[in-house]
Amino acid sequence: MCEERAVPARGPAKEATHMPRKLFCQLCPAAYAVSVAKQCAMRRLQDAAAHTPFCTRQQALLPVVLYRHKSLIRRTLGNTRPELQENKAVNLALAAPRVNGALLRPGQVFSFWHMVGSVTAKKGYREGLTISGGQACSDIGGGLCQMTNLIHWMVLHSPLTVTEHHHHDQLDLFPDYHRQVPFGTGTSVFYNYIDYRVRNDTGMAFQLVVYVTEKYLCGELRAQRPLAVKYHIAAQNERFVRRNGVVYREGEVWRTCVDKRTGNTLSRQLVRQNHARVLYDESFLPCVEEQQPGPAARGKGSAAP
């Protein structure tokens, strides 16, 4: 499963014991639109001030394929409307040509939104699945997180540096459906200030190839020459645990760098520590029962002699 395109939470906050103060963006739809426009403008100003060296597209392909991956476009995600999956297929087909061929020369930055641009109905984008405030909803351009998920998974198998990566706030929103990659390696994007960005800190060029078929979103990560190392990404210590009636998905995602010639492990990096609240029916999950101690119990301890 991959997380879908996220949007900032709209509407009033949920009730609490005391009523929290509303944010400006929660006052009304107009206030929300103003807040989004402000964030977009701020991101453009930041990039202009920093003189960010964005990458561009190149039609000619680099010779070496470092990694390939594909993900099923139409998937069953909880009780979401099937037409949102069909609309996502349209959205991915529109965005893929704008990313395909992205060439990262040394020192350059890949920005998903710099490549794709704004997603509007006028451009043909449709209403797809989004995540807002930890809940499934829909918006124009929804589903594009599947593309950044694909790109991120390929980038993890390379020496490229991820400089901006957002998650869905440690929530497990849908049951696994033909999962191909570890939980927690997904992404969250929203035009243009919640971005996915990668910088090339190496001495050679890399290239992203992204395209769609009838069933799959496909990708390749290419380079000028082969790497002397290979990368393995794996989940460890995964489990579902129930604490005080709430089920969480826990685990770790590790990346191991191995020397191709000797087979020796060169480095091991913790990519993600997962502690995600499960928001779907957990009755079929193999849960470990744990009782979290209350404040009084946590405050007790053995006295020093």
List each model region and its residues.
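Compositionally biased, low-complexity flexible segments
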Residues: R5-A13
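Well-ordered beta-sheet/strand-loop patches within structured domains
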Residues: H18-P305
